[in-house]
């Protein structure tokens, strides 16, 4: 194998789309001091500019409650102000995911995660719209129109995982996609009523789903749509929405008698075995193939991936997770306009906090603020020059990407030997 590069050959500008945003645990954790210390470190060392999280309207944020006597609603944005003030202080901005419901607006008992985010459609759509309008009015008053115009507003999170995806008593949205479109429409119109320049988008789906349907709905019904947002993980090709065995599992689990411990354990073990072998069907570079399709479906709209990672459990904490990032980001340049890694930290209590430092969590940093191998990959990518050579070298599982940093007149070679799990690597 011989690698040669003409340093005078064609280059193209590097758009640092992977640094535009990063994901985090739900909103209330952004009030923690350790969360803030870690996010400040990530902004400084990795260059992240926005942060996205679930649950901005959850009860643990104390945003909205209803008087049991008068039947009137009361609002407080104090905790949100506390978080947004902090973000601006460290040079970051919020990528505002509008979720979940305050419990006073719930139309059922469905919740998600350890912190019980309410995932039902609102029982009072007018009250939801009033909440959105009041929220936007407050942001304008506190931060100014020019500042809020730099933010993004995304309606909900993964509405196709829940009622539409076969999981009636769980998931992120207990309604159908038709219900979601109605929620999106009323929310987007309320945002544009506050300021036409405010940017709103969706459908925030898992597995690149419903992009065409979202565009079609918005065009047909004259609903504002400034960007497409979706998510993808490599195992989506086997586990994602629309895969029959996944849907059947969710359906079977939701209908299972939870008092029958033997049946519950048997189904759980079956699923664990399925997950253990899943990577046999996940090919190298699968996220790039997904992104190519999504880019085409998004048309002329900006394409934001507001969640992605290797999602490989313990291997994600080590060299596999690092090489996955180092290959995926260069390969997806020009396909996505934003690529928000999920998440910056293992300060993540969706199922309660972890007990071990390295446990295969989503974060780039451990709960104790120790950098994992994927963190170092982002550090390395942050140091790349502002130009990329168009010529790419690929040999079996080895890829070489060439960059140029004109500030010090250097050429940088990023060499990545990456292979999907349960597949052979060329050495």
Spans of model-derived segments:
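Generic beta-strand/beta-sheet core signal
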Residues: 54, 203, 230-231, 306, ...
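Carbohydrate-binding surface patches
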Residues: 397-427
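Catalytic-core region of carbohydrate-active enzymes that cleave or remodel glycosidic bonds
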Residues: 223, 227, 263-353, 357-360, ...
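Mature N-terminal, pre-catalytic/accessory segment of carbohydrate-active enzymes
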Residues: 1-49, 54
């Amino acid at each position: 194998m011989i690698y040669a590069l003409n340093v005078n050959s064609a280059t193209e500008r590097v758009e640092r789309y992977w640094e535009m945003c990063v994901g985090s645990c739900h909103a209330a954790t952004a009030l923690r001091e350790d969360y803030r210390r870690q996010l400040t470190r990530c902004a400084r060392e990795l260059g992240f500019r926005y942060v996205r999280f679930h649950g901005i309207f959850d009860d643990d944020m104390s945003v909205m409650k209803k008087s049991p006597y008068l039947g009137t609603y009361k609002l407080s944005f104090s905790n949100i102000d506390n978080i947004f003030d902090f973000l601006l202080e460290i040079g970051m901005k919020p990528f505002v995911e509008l979720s979940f419901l305050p419990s006073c607006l719930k139309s059922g008992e469905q919740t998600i995660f350890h912190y019980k985010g309410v995932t039902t459609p609102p029982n009072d759509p007018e009250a939801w719209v009033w909440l959105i309008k009041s929220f936007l009015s407050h942001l304008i008053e506190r931060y100014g129109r020019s500042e809020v115009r730099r933010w993004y507003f995304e309606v909900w999170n993964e509405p196709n995982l829940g009622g539409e995806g076969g999981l009636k008593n769980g998931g992120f949205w207990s309604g159908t996609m038709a219900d979601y479109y109605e929620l999106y429409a009323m929310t987007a119109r309320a945002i544009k009523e506050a300021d036409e320049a405010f940017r709103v988008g969706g459908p925030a789906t898992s597995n690149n789903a419903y992009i065409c349907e979202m565009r079609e709905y918005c065009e047909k019904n004259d609903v504002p749509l400034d960007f497409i947002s979706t998510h993808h993980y490599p195992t989506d090709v086997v586990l994602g929405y629309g895969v029959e065995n996944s849907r059947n599992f969710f359906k079977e689990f939701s209908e299972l008698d939870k008092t029958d411990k033997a049946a519950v354990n048997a189904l759980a073990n079956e699923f664990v075995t399925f997950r253990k072998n899943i990577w046999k069907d996940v090919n190298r570079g699968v996220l790039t193939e997904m992104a190519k399709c999504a880019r085409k479906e998004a048309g002329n709209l900006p394409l934001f991936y507001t969640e992605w990672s290797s999602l490989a459990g313990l291997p994600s904490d080590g060299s596999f997770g690092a090489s996955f990032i180092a290959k995926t980001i260069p390969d997806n340049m020009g396909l996505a306009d934003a690529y928000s890694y999920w998440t910056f930290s293992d300060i993540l209590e969706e199922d309660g906090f972890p007990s071990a430092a390295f446990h295969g969590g989503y974060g780039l940093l451990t709960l104790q603020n120790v950098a994992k191998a994927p963190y170092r990959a982002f550090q390395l990518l942050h140091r790349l020059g502002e130009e990329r050579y168009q010529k790419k070298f690929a040999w079996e599982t080895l890829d070489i990407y060439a960059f140029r940093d004109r500030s010090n007149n250097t050429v940088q070679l990023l060499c990545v030997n990456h292979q999907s799990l349960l597949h052979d690597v060329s050495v």
